[in-house]
Amino acid sequence: MTYARITGTGGCLPEKILTNHDLEKMVETTDEWIQERTGIKKRHVAGPEETTCDLAERAARRAMEMAGRSSADIDLIIVATTTPDRVFPSTACLLQKRLEIHGCAAFDVQAVCTGFVYALGVADRFIRTGGAKCALVVGAETLSRIVDWTDRTTCVLFGDGAGAVVLEASEEQGILSTHLHADGRFDNLLHVPKGISTAYSEVLAGEAYIEMKGNEVFKVAVNTLGRIVDETLEYNDIDQAEIDWLIPHQANIRIIQATARKLKMPMDRVVVTVDEHGNTSAASIPLALDVAVRDGRVRPGDLLMMEAFGGGFTWGSALLRF
């Protein structure tokens, strides 16, 4: 049986850091209030000339270096992003050009905070069916471009960054299953209400911002993530005690803690980066994975549960042997 196995990870965070104390000077908020409700202490913000593809490229090169792979080896590129460099071509095509990779399929996936899990699921299916042997899967965002920095309910949450993995065909166990879902009935609870075909002038003027009904999102997210955890465990016929690490989307420490309780996992078996990164949307899971791999927590053979929830609503999970 052919599996899709992660052989390299990479991450990239912009140099500029925005702390909670910095935000205290911008909006009516406090460091204590932000930490108590979100767990976030700081977030990274892209520079004026820094783009999503810039971050994606750095993360991708680091993942390829860890995997020992060159541009000639990559035969599929998928970038999960909500903040592409251009309307078209895709950020994946722009990344392909920078990496001097020619001819393979390259496309973007847009599932907001669930984007990386969606992209991982797509790449897994390519590899399992023989459509690819060495895929580059990236989650990259510059959410600071679509944050209203006068809205204290949202501007404290989000950060910029990119994470990447190299996924290769292998006889060894890798991705065991992915589970992808969406329900568009909840679109107005978390969204950017303006787009190219509905409000082009506002988009052009830079007036398209994230809007969120936080309490309602929280309630749906906690219940939905509980269900996706059950679905993943049941599908693979395993007990939660067998999972070595939970690597969740880094949205909010309270949501992360709720999912950990569902799995009966102590927080020291949960990879948490939301305090340092904020919510980087599609980048959060691969960034967290890269941090945990490079600091030695996640080791070969570990069983990992990834789960995410995002605008749409979208949600999903991946169970994999690292």
UniProtKB/Swiss-Prot annotation:
Keywords: Acyltransferase, Cytoplasm, Fatty acid biosynthesis, Fatty acid metabolism, Lipid biosynthesis, Lipid metabolism, Multifunctional enzyme, Transferase. SUPFAM superfamilies: Thiolase-like. Its EC number is 2.3.1.180. It is found in: Cytoplasm. CDD domains: KAS_III. The keyword Lipid biosynthesis applies. It comes from the Bacteria. GO terms for molecular function: 3-oxoacyl-[acyl-carrier-protein] synthase activity; beta-ketoacyl-acyl-carrier-protein synthase III activity. InterPro entries: ACP_syn_III_C, ACP_syn_III_N, FabH, Thiolase-like. The active site is at C113, H249, N279. GO terms for cellular component: cytoplasm. It catalyses: malonyl-[ACP] + acetyl-CoA + H(+) = 3-oxobutanoyl-[ACP] + CO2 + CoA. Pathway: Lipid metabolism; fatty acid biosynthesis. The keyword Lipid biosynthesis applies. It holds the Pfam family ACP_syn_III. Residues 250-254 are annotated as: ACP-binding. GO terms for biological process: fatty acid biosynthetic process. PANTHER family: 3-OXOACYL-[ACYL-CARRIER-PROTEIN] SYNTHASE, BETA-KETOACYL-[ACYL-CARRIER-PROTEIN] SYNTHASE III, CHLOROPLASTIC. Homodimer. Belongs to the thiolase-like superfamily. FabH family. Catalyzes the condensation reaction of fatty acid synthesis by the addition to an acyl acceptor of two carbons from malonyl-ACP. Catalyzes the first condensation reaction which initiates fatty acid synthesis and may therefore play a role in governing the total rate of fatty acid production. Possesses both acetoacetyl-ACP synthase and acetyl transacylase activities. Its substrate specificity determines the biosynthesis of branched-chain and/or straight-chain of fatty acids. The last Arg residue of the ACP-binding site is essential for the weak association between ACP/AcpP and FabH. This is Beta-ketoacyl-[acyl-carrier-protein] synthase III. It comes from Thioalkalivibrio sulfidiphilus (strain HL-EbGR7).
